[in-house]
Amino acid sequence: MAYKDSYLWRLRQAVGSDLVLMPGAMVAVQREDQRVLLTKRADDGTWCLPAGAAEPGGSFARTAIDELAEETGIEVSERDLIPFGCLSEAEAHTIHYPSGDVTHCFALLFLARAWRGDPVPDGDESTETRFVSLGEAPDPLHPPTAHALDLLSSYLGSGAFQVH
């Protein structure tokens, strides 16, 4: 869904650029060689995990599935989404957009090891896709993604759900 068709856009029409609290999801698509898919954001040129805000009536899983498909063309089923963490602390996940909008996001983080399709940037939100090793993420890295990749690394080492 295009941003101008989204719930967040409609909310922004009412509140302007003021701080908005927003639930959402991020997805770490991981290949067998352990590399994770990142996309390059069209708005600020940073690299990030596919992610987005929830729509009314949607779930965290539905948000993850929809955002992954919209931003990369990759399809994943709900049964293949593994929740591995939650990113909610304000200093880790408050985003200041180039437009002046400010959003404190609360994201459930998912790992996907099974999916269909090849990643293709949508040209609207993302301009490039790349699989990278966890220790070699490209610069500049979107700050919430840096935290999410740290949580993923901890999850992969411990198997325990991660919270930040």
Model-based region annotation:
Residues 45-46, 117-164:
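Nudix hydrolase/Nudix homology domain
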